[in-house]
Amino acid sequence: QISDAVLDKLLAYDPSSKVACETLVTTGQVVLAGEVKTKAYVDLQLIAREVIKKIGYTKGEYMFESNSCGVLSAIHEQSPDINRGVERQDPMEQGAGDQGMMFGYATNETENYMPLSLDLAHRILQVLADIRREGKVMTYLRPDAKSQVTIEYDDNGTPVRIDTIVVSTQHDDFIQPEDDSQTAQLKADEEMLAKIRQDVIEILMPRVIAEIHNEEVLALFNDQIVYHVNPTGKFVIGGPHGDTGLTGRKIIVDTYGGKGAHGGGAFSGKDPSKVDRSAAYAA
């Protein structure tokens, strides 16, 4: 999101900007790197901090907080060797900055032509984020979360039922152990997990299902769905403090969730002259 925010701001002020922005985030630190050719000036620190705040990293206990994290920039000018292959006298003859393989994929499983399992996983996380921002229920939620949906298909490639739903969501340490013993800690962790699992099934999923208006998709939900909620048992440490993040490291969830094919090039932080992005969109 930070890489795309930098790109958006540069294109807003200079539509001819050539941008390849990468972002690395880890405990208390953001590093921006890449190559840019533009006539615009943008405040990289402000852009990064606004995105981090919008996502929800606003507390020091997360070990990654919008106001206090360091933001370093190692962005430099685009290579003239690359630029000479991109910019031409006739804009209609614009070249590509690189070669590669790009793929498109579409399915009639959903109204947006995306694979059903990916669409449902995205819906789950979008509703989970809405619940967290509303702050009325599941008030222990923290910003980091992941989801995966496994669907059973028949021999004709038609979805017949949802088999498994995985929801991993970061949370506060909202139940404290009675003492310092390992037994007490395990008991507190089990109580937290039970509460989160109950809320996922009784609060989150009904809201997700309520937003689905396709009768064929609704028919896939059943009482036999296996729910894996925070399978490790605890998810207090998360975000960039728990897992270092890097632009382009999750290319499958950014595309078709394992369906179709992928040429390996990420999308975020790249202007349309980068065919990794524009050609994949065109396909």
State the predicted function of each range.
Residues R249-I251, Y256-A283:
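C-terminal catalytic subdomain
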Residues E35-V42, T232-G248:
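Short glycine/threonine-rich loop-to-helix capping motif typified by GTGT followed
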